[in-house]
């Protein structure tokens, strides 16, 4: 696991730097949210004052719920993003009967599964090889080595894809943390809607990868045994 653990270490370094960004920009995001709330509420108050025959109380309740919803999102954004990730990955792995969602946070384990799955092929090729066997069983050895390389390459590609997807998800959530406050003001709400859609789209990508990993891990676990 030492050789494949470097992937997890790189992921941990990237994740720590990205997660620290939430704390570094939280003050600026709070100021932006407060400014947009003041602008939105001020404009709404002016329209209510000039309007005739409008239900001010109903509009006030609606505006309060709207602001409260986005305040909840901003306060718990990082935790909610992790819940979304674990939910999508958990559903994908549960659909295939594989491990827990936390396993998907360690792409090095996926690479290790590939090494374990390919070891019987390598052992069989070694058993066929010898002073004379290398020439008499050349075709069988070549096929086994090719199969071992394909299995190894497939799992390493999936591990790298998981690494990239995790980094992408964290970067999207960090960008979302900056853009979500724009949902507090009607004229800029489209920015928040777009980033929320991107978070969900990245979550679906995690779900698909989890299903692929779950199926592959199950098949090759049986193969190794």
Question: How does the language model describe each region?
Answer:
Residues 1-36, 46, 55, 89:
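Binding/recognition "hotspot" determinant
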Residues 12, 16, 59, 63, ...:
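Short amphipathic alpha-helical coupling elements at transmembrane boundaries
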Residues 16, 20-27, 51-59, 132-137, ...:
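Membrane-helix interfacial "entry" motifs
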Residues 31-43, 143-151:
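Hydrophobic alpha-helical transmembrane segments
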Residues 41-64, 150-153, 157-190:
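Hydrophobic transmembrane alpha-helix segments characteristic of membrane transport
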Residues 54-73, 77, 193-205:
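Alpha-helical transmembrane segments and their helix-start/interface "positive-inside/aromatic belt" motifs
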Residues 73-171, 211-225:
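Non-cytosolic segments of integral membrane proteins
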Residues 144, 170-225:
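Hydrophobic alpha-helical transmembrane segments and adjacent short intramembrane/lumenal linkers
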């Amino acid at each position: 696991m030492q050789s494949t653990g470097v992937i997890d270490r790189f992921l941990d370094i990237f994740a720590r730097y990205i997660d620290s960004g939430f704390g570094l920009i939280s003050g600026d995001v709070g100021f932006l949210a407060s400014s947009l709330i003041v602008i939105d509420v001020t404009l709404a108050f002016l329209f209510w004052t000039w309007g005739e025959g409008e239900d001010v109380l109903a509009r006030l309740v609606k505006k309060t719920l709207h602001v409260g919803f986005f305040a909840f999102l901003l306060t718990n954004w990082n935790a909610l993003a992790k819940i979304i990730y674990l939910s999508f990955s958990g559903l994908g792995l549960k659909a295939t009967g594989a491990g827990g969602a936390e396993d998907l946070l360690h792409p090095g384990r996926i690479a290790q599964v590939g090494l374990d799955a390919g070891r019987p092929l390598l052992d069989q090729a070694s058993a066929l090889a010898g002073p004379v066997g290398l020439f008499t069983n050349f075709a069988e050895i070549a096929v086994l080595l090719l199969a071992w390389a394909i299995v190894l390459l497939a799992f390493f590609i999936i591990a790298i894809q998981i690494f990239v997807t995790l980094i992408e998800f964290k970067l999207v959530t960090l960008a979302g943390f900056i853009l979500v406050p724009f949902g507090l003001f009607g004229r800029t709400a489209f920015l928040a809607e777009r980033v929320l859609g991107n978070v969900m789209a990245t979550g679906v990508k995690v779900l698909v990868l989890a299903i692929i990993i779950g199926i592959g891990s199950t098949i090759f676990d049986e193969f190794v045994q």
